[in-house]
């Protein structure tokens, strides 16, 4: 019997008429960039939130959101998920969803500390495993467009 291949689809917005009210609040010690994933799955930057700040959004239940740390582009979680899909809520009531730091793997955390501690050093000069050197050599970059009402506090 042939194995059925499941096609993985990148998160993206789908057309939908069901609106929902969401309050995105940054609970972590890092500044967070809030992104909406548009209909092509591309990131659209909506806001930068400092610790404790929030933004109220009227969005759709089929519109996914994600957050990244402003400087390093490290993944953050929204409501404990790497990609947040709003749920249908009570009309006019904003549902609080928190932006937090996830539990990173030891490898990922080591890379974060090295990037932060030695931002201008060539990773090949460090006494670390070669595989880690290759991973560190690739800086994280994020491609996005700004929402026309982009908010930076």
What label would you give each PLM region?
Residues 1-7:
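Short, charge-rich amphipathic alpha-helices with coiled-coil/heptad character
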Residues 2, 12-14, 60, 71, ...:
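Cullin-RING E3 adaptor/co-adaptor recruitment helices
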Residues 10-13, 18-31:
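Asparagine-centered strand-capping/turn motif at beta-strand->loop junctions
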Residues 31-42:
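Short, surface-exposed beta-strand/strand-loop-strand elements in extracellular ectodomains
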Residues 43-51:
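Short, acidic Ser/Thr/Gly-rich low-complexity loop/linker segments typical of extracellular
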Residues 52, 61-71:
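A short, solvent-exposed beta-strand micro-motif common in secreted/extracellular proteins
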């Amino acid at each position: 019997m042939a194995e059925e291949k499941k096609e993985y689809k990148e998160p993206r917005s789908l057309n939908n008429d069901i609106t929902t009210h969401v309050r995105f609040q940054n609970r972590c010690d890092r500044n967070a960039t809030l992104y909406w994933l548009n209909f092509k799955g591309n990131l659209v930057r909506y806001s930068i939130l400092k610790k404790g700040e929030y933004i109220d959004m009227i969005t759709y239940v089929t519109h996914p959101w994600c957050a990244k740390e402003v400087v390093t582009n490290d993944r953050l979680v929204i409501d404990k998920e790497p990609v947040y899909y709003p749920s249908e809520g009570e009309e006019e009531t904003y549902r609080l969803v928190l932006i937090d730091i996830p539990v990173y793997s030891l490898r990922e955390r080591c890379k974060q500390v090295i990037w932060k501690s030695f931002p201008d050093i060539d990773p090949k000069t460090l006494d670390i495993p070669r595989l880690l050197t290759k991973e560190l050599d690739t800086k994280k970059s994020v491609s996005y467009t700004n929402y026309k009402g982009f908010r930076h506090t």
